[in-house]
Amino acid sequence: MLQQQESPIPRLGVGEEGVVGRHVFGEVWGVNDKLLQDDEYLKNLVIKAAEVANMHLVDVKVWRFGGGDKGGVSVIALVLESHIAIHTWPAYNYATIDVYTCGEHSRPWDAYDYIIKQLNPKTFTKTIVDRSSK
């Protein structure tokens, strides 16, 4: 059973002008398939990315899919500000990355850039969307 936790950040995600939401997401190609299969590496990657971006980690969950030596991994970090997610397809050297935060104190683009640097893809996309209520 999940227990509700009080946020250490007053009015998380709500600024003077309304809700502040920032969404950074994209895709990576040409990543080493061994990295994309390494669930422990990916788990630690999102934990460090949350720290780099000034997010407050609540929990991290990891799932393996597809079996065999080319099965994918999904890692989702729940942070007080929202989430970080990585979904991998090692057989295609491909992954998707999603970082969403609420509030003005966190820097989702820093988390995204950190993940990109560590995965070292041959190519990637990066989309930044303002999801604020302003």
Swiss-Prot record:
Its cofactor is pyruvate. Binds 1 pyruvoyl group covalently per subunit. GO terms for molecular function: adenosylmethionine decarboxylase activity; arginine decarboxylase activity. GO terms for cellular component: cytosol. Its EC number is 4.1.1.19. Keywords: Autocatalytic cleavage, Decarboxylase, Lyase, Polyamine biosynthesis, Pyruvate, Schiff base, Zymogen. One of its GO terms (biological process) is arginine catabolic process. Is synthesized initially as an inactive proenzyme. Formation of the active enzyme involves a self-maturation process in which the active site pyruvoyl group is generated from an internal serine residue via an autocatalytic post-translational modification. Two non-identical subunits are generated from the proenzyme in this reaction, and the pyruvate is formed at the N-terminus of the alpha chain, which is derived from the carboxyl end of the proenzyme. InterPro entries: AdoMetDC_fam_prok (IPR003826), ArgDC (IPR027549), S-AdoMet_deCO2ase_core (IPR016067), S-AdoMet_deCOase_pro-enz (IPR017716). The record marks 81-82 as: Cleavage (non-hydrolytic). It comes from the Archaea. Pfam families: AdoMet_dc. It catalyses: L-arginine + H(+) = agmatine + CO2. The active site is at residues 82, 87, 102. The modification Pyruvic acid (Ser) is found at residue 82. Pathway: Amine and polyamine biosynthesis; agmatine biosynthesis; agmatine from L-arginine: step 1/1. Heterooctamer of four alpha and four beta chains arranged as a tetramer of alpha/beta heterodimers. Belongs to the prokaryotic AdoMetDC family. Type 1 subfamily. Specifically catalyzes the decarboxylation of L-arginine to agmatine. Has no S-adenosylmethionine decarboxylase (AdoMetDC) activity. This is Arginine decarboxylase proenzyme. It comes from Caldivirga maquilingensis (strain ATCC 700844 / DSM 13496 / JCM 10307 / IC-167).
